[in-house]
Amino acid sequence: MSPDKKVAIITGSARGIGAATMKVFAQHGYASIGLDILPEGENIAREINQQGGEGLFLQCDVADERRVKECVKFVGDRYGRIDVLVNNAGVVLVKPFDEISWEEFQRTTNINLGGHFLLCKYVLPFMKQQKSGVIINMGSVSGHVGQTDHVMYGATKGAIIAMTRALAWELAPYNVRVNSISPGSVDTPMLRGDIQLESTRTSTPFEKVKQEREAEQAFRRWADPLEIAEPIYFLASEGASFVTGADWLVDCGWVAK
């Protein structure tokens, strides 16, 4: 690998926004490292390599501290640097608040917020030593507006946005930028699963629930994962060199309504 080649770690890389982001960074010349609990993430890395890029997949549960530490160390030892961290991995919980179990609360918090914490914790020593780096956390429109049956998902996303702002100030002396991106509805397996749960719970046809969600976007459609991956790359680029502590709503006007 060229000593000038930059390295990006993307979590939740097996599908959806994470897979699209991994491909975009590889297209821009990065060594694109994907982490996901799903083994299918290997397919994304293989596709990148077949197209002449540099992709690597490591199976990882972002809520498992030992495994996160191992994966970050492996990347750091192999490449000698970590330039970008995209904290994308997460889960959604769709359930009335008073029906949420303590175990569901812990799982949602551990993966969504805990995963961000662990990746930041173990990547930061590399970025501090380099005196450079970019962290992009995954917020959500749910961190800005209230949604019925999405209390825990929204709570974790709101916490991620708050963590982003505080961490941006803490890491500024090390020339490390920290931002979050908050998508609206994106056509991913997670969103389709969310719609299916709501459809089943309310006995409403899937297509009707889907159309209601699409109506929340100004363009009356869901985003393609690439439409989130490209803004993520911009936040990591030199074009965003004066941007830190920001949350970028890529929600097709949802919150502006």
Each model region followed by its residue ranges:
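Active-site helix of classical SDR
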Residues: 120, 156, 164
